[in-house]
Amino acid sequence: HARTTAEYYGGHSDWSRIGELVSELDIPVFGNGDIWGANDALAMVTETGCAGVAIGRGCQGRPWLFADIKNAFAGSDERVDPTLGDVCRVIERHAELLTEFYDGDERMAVHDLRKHVAWYLKGFPVGGSTRRAFMECENLEDVRREIGRLDPNIRFPERIADKPRGRVRFAKKVHLPYGWLESRETTHEEREALFGDDPMDASY
């Protein structure tokens, strides 16, 4: 990942660091950072020589990014051009899968969905009132009602396609145990302090 914790989401990730790793290691290196579109993936591989790319925020609300990247690596210019209706079908399916994940608890599922809705609707001319309405949904019926109020024929805005989205805040102060950056190993006590009792717990 070509951005430090201190850099947070500010600026563009430093792909040259990925290239340095590629030149130093004899194992495949996958690069990550600022992959917002298929052309970004091609550029990273070309510039760094990495074996592949890992996708982070770029796929938030844009699950078709993986298909675009697959096509790009295959030498195809084909890209997904979704309508708002296409995106709404993804939103509905996402809500259904979350309901399954939460053992049928629609309220929990729809509350979880809220944080994704802004990503899905980013750039579409739907207005703040629509986003607020989704934030007030309590079950699948509510979600489907709000979807039904949208124009399914609106095209995905070209002006924001493959453009950075989400937080772009700059540097922040990092709090780490004394000597952390000078050591590649951690003690049991340090792992407990950072991750809790179970060092394999990824909930943090």
Give names to the regions the model predicted.
Residues Y9, S16, E20-G31, I35-Y204:
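Alpha/beta catalytic cores of nucleotide-metabolism and tRNA/nucleoside-modifying enzymes
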Residues H1-Y9:
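Glycine-rich, proline-tolerant flexible connector loops at the mouths of alpha/beta enzymes
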